[in-house]
């Protein structure tokens, strides 16, 4: 649903740049309907169910027992993706939501010999950069500063890239940390030397969050998601080209919620609802962290507005609160359409994607192949000059099965074309075979007649290369064909 909403918004914004007055109002009406469905039903009800199921464990320990945890990424999650690789590159993309990461994985799965593994983990509350980035580093303990301005990993600061590299080198002396742009700006020789000399490299990428966090650009966040998909796939390919045996692991510090329409006033909590706002340690549109002693000021009625989150993973002395569903804390400035920091699935579920390339001939190597079509109709006899042939795309165009465009045409035994040429796309991704049926309409060429004895063939060829993939034998029992073009 999140992915469908994102793609719908992106498509709608594209239509606004095309002059078509007839479609403008109907398109707006459809988008408004979908907006109401997403905001008032999906986000509200799905996260109400999620909160109801999880709030007890959040209050007790701050996380759900069972799913992988972001604060255990380095010691418990990362090793399961590394295998025997000598070099591991961790790409951390700020605000890479899980459903966006699935698009990255789908793109990488189309690589020859590319192997992709997709998993997820739960982010640490509050789901913000200042907490998520330290959680992804090696540590025994995280500690929130008394004023909430930074998080320490085993007593070491983590706010900047050099500081994160210092934390990494504390456990892996050859480790490096740098921005993805800095890595790509290196000369090829420098990149290869870096990966050869380092067993562990953290690359930091930031496209989604830097777009969404600004009021002037927050409505471009879904375009930023599309750019991020392409950039991360290209970055992973580059790493595996620079170091063929490397393992790439992509993850994020947090996700986000975005809605085209701003919230109503009733969906925002102000100071009357928050009697302890005089002393917040951390405060955002979707999260609140206060000293333990401030919690006593909260009434029983107000407690029902929030989800209580144990903050033990960030040290003692703090209590966390997140608004339920898609409610925001009212704060001046910032953005209202793009937010994160809370406990919704969209904010809390972060991806973990493993990618590596297998050498040709190895047991892990899987080559790509084109999606194929075959004739579904049992009959092989044509009795009308205007007719249809039903075909089926044999596999969904997913992973190593790539979309392909074909040309279909009827020929005689000498290879002369006796029908028009029909384009057929094998690009359907549905796992339901009935949704992969292709209907091809043909019109026979004008002629004196067709021989019922002579064989005719339905020929399928790749449109790009002209290579014949298959041909099926048919009988054409039509005494004449029309001389006029009826538009088929």
Task: Locate predicted features.
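Feature captures the catalytic ectodomains and active-site-proximal regions of enzymes
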Residues: 1-488
